[in-house]
Amino acid sequence: MSEDIFDAIIVGAGLAGSVAALVLAREGAQVLVIERGNSAGAKNVTGGRLYAHSLEHIIPGFADSAPVERLITHEKLAFMTEKSAMTMDYCNGDETSPSQRSYSVLRSKFDAWLMEQAEEAGAQLITGIRVDNLVQRDGKVVGVEADGDVIEAKTVLLADGVNSILAEKLGMAKRVKPTDVAVGVKELIELPKSVIEDRFQLQGNQGAACLFAGSPTDGLMGGGFLYTNENTLSLGLVCGLHHLHDAKKSVPQMLEDFKQHPAVAPLIAGGKLVEYSAHVVPEAGINMLPELVGDGVLIAGDAAGMCMNLGFTIRGMDLAIAAGEAAAKTVLSAMKSDDFSKQKLAEYRQHLESGPLRDMRMYQKLPAFLDNPRMFSGNPELAVGVARDLFTIDGSAPELMRKKILRHGKKVGFINLIKDGMKGVTVL
């Protein structure tokens, strides 16, 4: 057993863990971060978009020194059928404040940089070690068991990712259900910087974020994504795990077909595959939230299910960062009173209520709303069908626009459209 007792041991050097370590170390706390990967970020996978507001609050102007890829200024939302797509395009040319910006990032580089900031502030990092168990004494978590050694701490922060076995062992989290998560796959495709900028109409460090619904997941709940990096593209898709037993294709085949789609293939043509990754993604929002606080222990980030898929935006990294800061503030308060009980650490939830939990609660009904086959089959077909008729002239007698829309609407069912519309209004 180590003779040192840390103020906090953090399991996982992802965004939540690294931020918590940074905020704690800045205030002189003795912090140990244990990461099972060979480096911070080595095991972390994301589509690739970081909303800056939560980290800007902690490290003002971080983008000037952090390895961010591109500033997102172009947004694309596409409804896709097997061979066609109807795309909405938004370009933000206005001046934005640092907290309003978002960036494409590669986690292996970005997480390593963030952990370096924590180490420079005084945090300690151990890599390549897995935490096997939490050490409890009189019902209170007092440390961890890792690689046969017991290391003690006044508090332990579990930031070990979705499906946290440690949280489950404590009884603070239930076993993850298929309806709570999705399977994500991603390819990193290398292209010259100039080619990326030409294809996506970008200038300088501008970047594009593209989301696709419909055929990428073969009409099942989920969607495709594409983010521009400096000289690579992050391309992938996410599909609800509970829908995969109904899938006619494997997830790798979905990705291959997505890459061959006429709306996607020209964007990645000539690219070189440099990385492939897969990950389980929390999807149920606040509905899969574990018990966040115990005696001597807190849970943050993906381990706490902190992810929001709104269809038009996908958030996870900014929530993890905010949770890491909230956890650190809670531990610092507990250190002042030398009280690490569940009752004292409940301040953590109060901090979260002004950020991640507030946002997650607002959209808590959205996962159920999106888990509707019409969202990913009938509605994309409706959008593409109407667009096709609007832009096709074949010499036959013209048809009023409302009749075109009505004709395609019948295929989905007007009652269904009304029901979905009314439900969407209440959810959004």
From Swiss-Prot:
Q: Look up keyword Transport and say if it applies.
A: yes
UniProt-recorded Gene Ontology molecular function terms = FAD binding; oxidoreductase activity
Give the required cofactors: FAD
Domain of life, per UniProt, equals: Bacteria
Which SUPFAM superfamilies does the protein's record reference?
FAD-linked reductases, C-terminal domain, FAD/NAD(P)-binding domain
Matching InterPro entries: FAD-bd (IPR002938), FAD/NAD-bd_sf (IPR036188), FixC-like (IPR039651)
Keywords (alphabetical) are: Electron transport, FAD, Flavoprotein, Oxidoreductase, Transport
A Pfam family assignment: FAD_binding_3
Question: What family does the database annotate?
Answer: Belongs to the ETF-QO/FixC family.
Role according to the record: Could be part of an electron transfer system required for anaerobic carnitine reduction.
Q: What's the protein called, per UniProt?
A: Protein FixC
Per the UniProt record, the lineage of the source organism begins with: Bacteria, Pseudomonadati, Pseudomonadota, Gammaproteobacteria, Enterobacterales
From the UniProt record, report the name of the gene that encodes this protein: fixC
